[in-house]
């Protein structure tokens, strides 16, 4: 008689069970990682506009996000993001109070994950030149670790 070669059904079932357990642990971790990186990226995209806003304040111009700024206005030059709601320059709502305070607001949407869609990122400047960042209006699936350390959920 020849000796049998190969795996028994029990051995194959054990391997499938181990792979299932590993997948059950890895998939939620990956989804959290993806959401966290998307929030961090969106915060970075909005925060990158701080330099342009500072330049506008130094030049004494009104900060806008417009395709055709007037002579007294300064276009902050935002490039469209795949993570933010809206299209083009309308993705960032700019509030320039002309007293040195500025507010840049963006809402996560479009291709952002469902756990973070709808969260609002606000980067604001006080008249003393200090910039702050906060995340508000988070969806119910939001987890505290999604917010980067420099932009907490409030």
Swiss-Prot record:
Compartment(s): Fimbrium; Membrane
Bilayer disposition of the protein: Single-pass membrane protein
InterPro entries (alphabetical): Bac_GSPG_pilin, N_methyl_site, Pilin, Pilin-like, T4P/T2SS_Core
Residues bearing the modification N-methylphenylalanine: 7
SUPFAM superfamilies given in the database record: Pili subunits (SSF54523)
GO cellular component terms attached to this protein's record: membrane; pilus; type II protein secretion system complex
Keywords: Disulfide bond, Fimbrium, Membrane, Methylation, Transmembrane, Transmembrane helix
Record-annotated disulphide pairs: 133-151
Principal location listed in the UniProt entry: other
Propeptide regions on this chain: 1-6
TM region(s), chain numbering: 7-27
Subunit structure: The pili are polar flexible filaments of about 5.4 nanometers diameter and 2.5 micrometers average length; they consist of only a single polypeptide chain arranged in a helical configuration of five subunits per turn in the assembled pilus.
Family to which the UniProt record says this protein belongs: Belongs to the N-Me-Phe pilin family.
Name of the protein in question: Fimbrial protein
Protein's organism: Pseudomonas aeruginosa
């Amino acid at each position: 008689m020849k000796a049998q070669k190969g795996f028994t059904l029990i051995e194959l079932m054990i391997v499938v069970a181990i792979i299932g357990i590993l997948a059950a642990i890895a998939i939620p971790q990956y989804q959290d990682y993806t959401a966290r990186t998307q929030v961090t990226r969106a915060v970075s995209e909005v925060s990158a506009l701080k330099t342009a806003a500072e330049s506008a304040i130094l030049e004494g111009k009104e900060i806008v996000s417009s395709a055709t700024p007037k002579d007294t206005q300064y276009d902050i030059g935002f490039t469209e993001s795949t993570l933010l709601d809206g299209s083009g320059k309308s993705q960032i709502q700019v509030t320039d109070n002309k007293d040195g305070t500025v507010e840049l607001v963006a809402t996560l949407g479009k291709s952002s994950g469902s756990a973070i869609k709808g969260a609002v990122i606000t980067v604001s400047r006080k008249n003393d030149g200090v910039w702050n960042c906060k995340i508000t209006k988070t969806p119910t699936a939001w987890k505290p670790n999604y917010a980067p350390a420099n932009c907490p959920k409030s």
